[in-house]
Every structure is written in C-alpha cells, then in structure tokens.
Regions:
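Glycine-rich N-terminal loop/short-helix segment of MobA-like nucleotidyltransferase
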Residues: 1-29, 42-44, 219
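Conserved N-terminal catalytic core of the sugar/cofactor nucleotidyltransferase
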Residues: 2-5, 31-107, 118, 196-197
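Phosphate- and divalent-cation-binding pockets in alpha/beta enzyme and binding domains
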Residues: 13, 59-62, 86, 92, ...
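Conserved beta-strand segments of alpha/beta enzyme cores
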Residues: 24, 73-75, 129, 150, ...
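Catalytic-core segments of class I nucleotidyltransferases/pyrophosphorylases
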Residues: 101-106, 111, 117-124, 137-138, ...
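A short, conserved acidic/glycine-rich loop-to-beta-strand motif
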Residues: 126-136, 141
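Short beta-strand-to-turn element immediately C-terminal to the catalytic PLP-Schiff-base lysine
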Residues: 144-146
Length: 245
C-alpha cells in the first residue's frame, strides 16, 4: 500500500522554531511530527511512502537514513529547487505513486485519531476518484458537498468568495465540511492532471473537475484532529499524545 506525506512546508507560522529545523522535524512528545505520521501509516499497513521535501530538506533525508527508513520503502520527492504546492507535489511523485492501487495523502503536520486503514478500505468500496477526510470543525474556508457527499464547491466564510464549476451554484444549498489534509486518491487522478503543470493546489484541481467526476467526503464519527501549524498547537499536541499514552 502506497502513501505520500507532505513534508515540504516552510513552517512560516512556526517561526523562529523553523528557522533552522524543517517543520516536519519539530518534536512532539519526544518524536518529530514526521515520525508520528510515518508510524501511523506503517501501523495501518502502508509500506511504500513518498515524502516531499523543500525547506531544509537535507535534514529530513538525514533523519530518514538515521532511522533506516523505519523498515519500509521510502521515496524522497525532491522539491528543494521549487515548491510545487499540494497538487504539483502529488504530480511530481507520479513515478512512485502510479500503479493499480489507490494511495493515501497525509500532511506531516496533522495529528488525528482516524483509522487510516478504514478510510482506505472505504475508498476501495465506494471507488470515487478521490475520498477526502472531512469534519464539521469551525474554520473560515469550507468545501461544499451535496446530499450524496459529492464535492460541488468551496466557500470562504470571511470574504464571501465562492468557487464552483456548476452553473447557477447556490452555496447555501450544500453541506459545509472542513478538509483535514488526509485523502485517498485513485491512480486515475494522473490522467485528469495531464494538462496541469508546475505549482498548483490540489483543492483547486478538485474543484475544477468535481462536476465531471466523483470527489467524495468521508465524515468519520468522533474524529479528533489537530493541525499543528502554530506554536500554541504544539503544546496541544504534546498534551494529546500524553493522554493517548
């Protein structure tokens, strides 16, 4: 089973902690964020993992080598010359991710209690182009889904901006969900990406194709999720992991 971890972020909201350490290597409860995610994926059965790098990427390479790649196959997708965003990052790793089976994408700065194997198996059973783990948490930007949990649009509650490729789109008629940074993709996604090049957002890509194919929401019960993007969330993550132990 294949997966990809996004570990190329600049970590600007965590400065000065990220001035000399990549965000993915910041420690939480004695282990780097990246290690927590690798082990969670490994425990769920993922044994081939791509990891993209950019800011201070050589430190991530050294970390992986020092830990013998945690006993699994790891492919480093090098974006040190140019950061490609989420969509571009996936396409850049196509040579590793392509094949007959779906693959899972996981941000390095996300902690959750999601059963990744269950999410992956749900995708296999329903067989959309992509399955997005979502939640009802409060945020400013929401993905909009219909009654069948099919992606139809996006809205920014703060600015009022709405995005959709559906004609006569009325955002208030749709369910609002926050995206988690965890999703499962069919390898057929690369056929849809053929004309997309360079740096691009996976969300903008999903929005551009959702009227033509199935991009589905997976709203897990009792989901607990933490985005470790700010210094205060590091403390929350420490507390969470201590409670788990």
């Amino acid at each position: 089973m294949k997966a990809m971890i996004f570990a190329a972020g600049l970590g600007t909201r965590l400065k000065p902690l990220t001035d000399h350490t990549p965000k993915a290597l910041l420690p939480i409860n004695g282990k780097p964020m990246l290690e927590h995610v690798i082990l969670k994926l490994k425990d769920a059965g993922f044994n081939q993992i791509a990891i993209n790098i950019h800011h201070l990427g050589e430190q991530i390479i050294d970390f992986l080598q020092a830990n013998n790649n945690f006993g699994i196959e790891i492919f480093v997708s090098d974006e040190r010359d140019y950061l490609l965003d989420t969509g571009g990052g996936i396409k850049h790793a196509e040579s590793f991710l392509q094949g007959d089976e779906p693959f899972l994408i996981h941000n390095a700065d996300i902690l959750s209690n999601i059963d990744l194997r269950k999410l992956y198996e749900h995708h296999l059973e329903t067989n959309p182009l992509a399955t997005l783990l979502v939640s009802k948490r409060k945020t400013s930007r929401y993905l909009l889904f219909d009654k069948e949990n099919k992606l139809c649009g996006w809205r920014n509650r703060e600015t009022g901006e709405v995005k959709s490729f559906y004609p006569y789109f009325e955002p208030n008629q749709y369910k609002e969900f926050a995206f988690s940074g965890i999703h499962v993709l069919s390898p057929k996604i690369f056929d849809w990406m053929e004309e997309w090049t360079g740096k691009f957002s996976i969300i903008n890509f999903y929005l551009s194709i959702c009227a033509k194919t199935n991009i589905h929401a997976y709203d897990a019960e009792n989901l607990r999720l933490l985005d470790i993007g700010k210094p205060e969330s590091l403390a929350l993550a420490e507390q969470w992991l201590k409670e788990e132990i």
